[in-house]
Regions:
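Catalytic cores of enzyme domains
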Residues: 92, 99, 108-322
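Iron-sulfur (Fe-S) cluster-binding modules
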Residues: 1-112, 122-127, 299, 303-328
Length: 328
């Protein structure tokens, strides 16, 4: 339920097509399918192109935000030519090597997942069998200054800075892999490409899906951004990391209460054949547009407070263990 007094800005609502964004996302669908290209994809690939363009243009009215998304900002090198002969190493060695490289080149989190067609947007293909998922953390003091505004765009600028950093990590790693003679493609945000990053990052062990529709990591909470590298370098997949945040979200209402347009469901929804946490796009995006990226749900998440995520993970796992013990 939206907060009293909140009215969606017609600058954005007037650009909604007849189709609901929730329908495009598959809300209520019971059959498993690939995600459809949507917001942040090229505007000719979906019905929300005019709205997407207006949101971007509105955000770029902020000189500080516009500067961070300028082509002059460092986002990493262009791809090099792949070495002719691939270096032969065991998958375990390569897995360790790419993780070490990413962490030594501005990355904070890294995990590996096998490519699954369900991670790939309809109409796209990822020909490589492996996905290296990368996370970069955000500065909480900056992030916590939500919602951003033209007078104080600090939190939106922080998001843009970390997207740039995530881009540098994945592009540097791409060139490292190409130099070893293996194929590699950098997949970076904020604009969408072939990969739906959150499901892949969950599979790679970077965290769990939160009630706010974003990831929660056991160390950094929701205060991080993603990029990825797709490759045919022989690797080993990591396992998903279940540290109890899903149980926590079930009883927590911090993000859903804080959300001005009331876009966050308090219960899981059926989305493309999977029951999961979901955010109402049609309610979220007008406020996201007006609030210059918003970010309230991420900043207010109890897991995002510095030092809180490890303590909450320990608490939730201990609680789960007690329940198992009591039921034995």
């Amino acid at each position: 339920v939206s907060k009293p007094g909140y009215v969606a800005n017609p600058l954005f609502t007037n650009l909604f097509p007849a189709t609901s964004g929730n329908a495009v996302n598959g809300l209520g669908e019971t059959e498993i399918r690939r995600p459809s290209p949507f917001f942040w994809h090229p505007v000719n690939m979906h019905e929300f192109g005019a709205l997407q363009t207006e949101v971007i243009n509105y955000h770029r009215r902020s000189p500080e935000i516009s500067a961070e998304y300028s082509p002059t900002r460092p986002r990493g090198p262009k791809p090099i030519e792949k070495a002719a002969i691939p270096v032969d190493k065991a998958p375990s060695e390569w897995a360790e090597a790419v993780k070490s490289f990413a962490l030594e080149h501005e990355g904070d989190l890294v995990g590996i997942a096998a490519t699954d067609p369900l991670y790939v947007y309809d109409g796209y293909e990822i020909p490589h069998p492996w996905l290296i998922m990368i996370g970069v953390t955000m500065d909480y003091d900056n992030l916590s200054q939500v919602p951003p505004s033209f007078d104080n765009p600090t939190s939106a600028v922080e998001v843009a800075r970390q997207y740039n950093r995530a881009s540098r990590v994945c592009r540097e790693l791409t060139n490292f892999i190409l130099a070893q003679g293996w194929e590699a493609e950098a997949l970076n945000g904020p604009f969408a490409k072939s990969l739906n990053m959150i499901p892949a990052a969950i599979a790679a062990g970077l965290g769990q899906l939160g009630k706010h529709g974003q990831m929660i990591n056991r160390t950094y909470g929701s205060s991080f951004r993603l990029s990825a590298v797709a490759t045919n370098m022989p690797l080993i997949a990591d396992s998903p990391d279940d540290f109890g945040s899903d149980d926590f979200c079930t009883s927590c209402q911090v993000c859903s209460t804080a959300c001005p347009p009331g876009a966050i469901f308090d219960t899981k929804q059926m989305v493309r054949g999977v029951e999961k946490w979901y955010v109402d796009f049609d309610k979220c995006i007008p406020y996201f547009g007006e609030a210059l990226d918003c970010g309230i749900c991420i900043a207010k998440c109890p897991y995002s407070r510095p030092g809180a995520a490890p303590r909450l993970a320990e608490k939730m796992l201990a609680r789960r263990a007690r329940k198992v013990s009591e039921g034995a």
